[in-house]
Amino acid sequence: MNHSNQMHHDNHASHDHHSGHAHHHGNFKVKFFVSLIFAIPIILLSPLMGVNLPFQFTFPGSEWVVLILSTILFFYGGKPFLSGGKDEIATKKPGMMTLVALGISVAYIYSLYAFYMNNFSSATGHTMDFFWELATLILIMLLGHWIEMNAVGNAGDALKKMAELLPNSAIKVMDNGQREEVKISDIMTDDIVEVKAGESIPTDGIIVQGQTSIDESLVTGESKKVQKNQNDNVIGGSINGSGTIQVKVTAVGEDGYLSQVMGLVNQAQNDKSSAELLSDKVAGYLFYFAVSVGVISFIVWMLIQNDVDFALERLVTVLVIACPHALGLAIPLVTARSTSIGAHNGLIIKNRESVEIAQHIDYVMMDKTGTLTEGNFSVNHYESFKNDLSNDTILSLFASLESQSNHPLAISIVDFAKSKNVSFTNPQDVNNIPGVGLEGLIDNKTYKITNVSYLDKHKLNYDDDLFTKLAQQGNSISYLIEDQQVIGMIAQGDQIKESSKQMVADLLSRNITPVMLTGDNNEVAHAVAKELGISDVHAQLMPEDKESIIKDYQSDGNKVMMVGDGINDAPSLIRADIGIAIGAGTDVAVDSGDIILVKSNPSDIIHFLTLSNNTMRKMVQNLWWGAGYNIVAVPLAAGILAFIGLILSPAIGAILMSLSTIIVAINAFTLKLK
């Protein structure tokens, strides 16, 4: 199977709000041009009211040609609207298609009556038909829908581009070393594929041979090329920049990064937010409003003028000018655009409600390590406090216990011990002490690695001056305990991310208060916070403390956004009004988090808030346009200003209706991230 085409198809079909529209109505472009062939002679052979031409196209029997061509046009060109109206009524959700179907049906049926009266009745006088209005009406509707479908398609353009990134085939390295080109669908997990410079990486995987720079701009929005070496992860769909590499496949098909992103975005687009449910409800009421106004205007004009032609024209114009569709598409089109732009830039919107809530956020709470800082620790100091143990022995004991952990602090210690050629052993019975550290057996002795809070809580002695000095330098400090005695310590420094300071400044400029939550000691937390400009700091926290702090802030009616690790901070992310999982990488399917930030870049927090602001502004613009248009257009179509000579024909009504939807679509398409 061609993954690219399949994903593209799945994405397109997911535009649920409009897919029915596209589904029943075939190719509007073809229908428009075929209908144009029928419409031209209908218009030329019909008497154009108020237009005096120096020549006539009519001939004896031409009215029969008009009747036949109009009938063909009604059933062929009008079929999308007739079948669409039928489906809307069947689902008990009458809307734009039903209004258009009613309008063209009234025009056609009355024209049949007029044809009979003019050709077979003994009644004197001429009854005006609506054949040329019918022709122009159907033509304009088809043209409008053709343009609209293009605009709707473009709304999710960024996501479509992502869907097309995967190649159709890959070079598989066989067990005997031979290379063979195979379809993407034939690639399995653990296969080895070879990717040359300039080629698209076919699947997610790990580099097992070679090194290169990868262009991930179309996949995650990362503008700079990323250097990749052996054992580094690569994402399917990114471009191999400089060298030939061999990649061991780790995920294929639906498990791949791009497929996961497409699935999450499709799900988000199909879920309706509260604002969209409201607009759908209003759009539903608009149908009944338009029909009521149309019928009332027909009755009123019959009473005023006793002119069935004019009264009927008002009815048809009201039916075709009303556009619940503009209101119904106001939010889905913006959503399709914003979610696809977000995905294209590494911002995966899982919960659409969070885009609306983001406008009201009061606090952004952030974990320190990995969110505000790099999380790449370096050992700056280690020391033994026991005379019979050397500094390197203390380092060995630390490394032995930490070798069983994947925490950034632990990885840093193990790597440092290796770089110093300090040997360490495999401990036994290693257990995690939540919010504190580790404990385990080494040579039948129990050791614990703890933080300073543990020492204070258990009243264990330590060098307070040394701790203060190292902590104020921004070091995270861990202690080694044997038999309730502190026998050693290690201090590790972390770098503040380049974009963290600007992110904090941007939050403050938006009147949003940044809050640091960390399990680290007070001195380190405040040192980092001071450098970043954060005044609200909570340090030495246990994992469950973060959730309770968020709850406390919310109890005063504040809206809280939490940014942290999608796994370790899961309870906090769920508790917050908006949970943002940062640095998810290819694991975008993390359960917690309303928003997934693929990269570990604090700037993306601001990018999300900006995208949210821009999205809501476009939604409001579209809703005002969709509602305002109908409030003005429907009374005009009914003839409320006829006394000053302002009368809209059905054709003008059709043009305005089509334009109203096209304007909504184009406005959605102009949504940008920045």
UniProtKB/Swiss-Prot annotation:
Which superkingdom? Answer: Bacteria
| Coiled-coil intervals | none
InterPro entries listed in its UniProt record? ATPase_P-typ_cyto_dom_N, ATPase_P-typ_P_site, ATPase_P-typ_TM_dom_sf, ATPase_P-typ_transduc_dom_A_sf, HAD-like_sf, HAD_sf, P-typ_ATPase_IB, P_typ_ATPase
Localization terms from the record: Cell membrane
Where is Mg(2+) annotated to bind? 565, 569
Gene3D superfamilies of this UniProt entry? Calcium-transporting ATPase, cytoplasmic domain N, Calcium-transporting ATPase, cytoplasmic transduction domain A, HAD superfamily/HAD-like
Q: Which Pfam families match?
A: E1-E2_ATPase, Hydrolase
Report the EC code(s) recorded for this entry: 7.2.2.8
The residues annotated as the active site are: 367 (4-aspartylphosphate intermediate)
Q: Which reaction does it catalyse?
A: Cu(+)(in) + ATP + H2O = Cu(+)(out) + ADP + phosphate + H(+)
Q: Which UniProt keywords apply?
A: ATP-binding, Cell membrane, Copper, Copper transport, Ion transport, Magnesium, Membrane, Metal-binding, Nucleotide-binding, Phosphoprotein, Translocase, Transmembrane, Transmembrane helix, Transport
Q: Where is the composition biased (Basic and acidic residues)?
A: 7-19
Tell me the Gene Ontology biological-process terms attached to this UniProt entry: copper ion homeostasis
Q: Provide the membrane topology annotation.
A: Multi-pass membrane protein
Region feature Disordered, mapped onto this chain: 1-22
Q: Name one cellular component (GO) term.
A: plasma membrane
Q: Which family does it belong to?
A: Belongs to the cation transport ATPase (P-type) (TC 3.A.3) family. Type IB subfamily.
Function, in words: Involved in copper transport.
**Entry protein name:** Probable copper-transporting P-type ATPase B
Q: Which organism is it from?
A: Staphylococcus aureus (strain USA300 / TCH1516)
Starting at the broadest rank, the lineage of the source organism is: Bacteria, Bacillati, Bacillota, Bacilli, Bacillales
This protein's gene is called copB
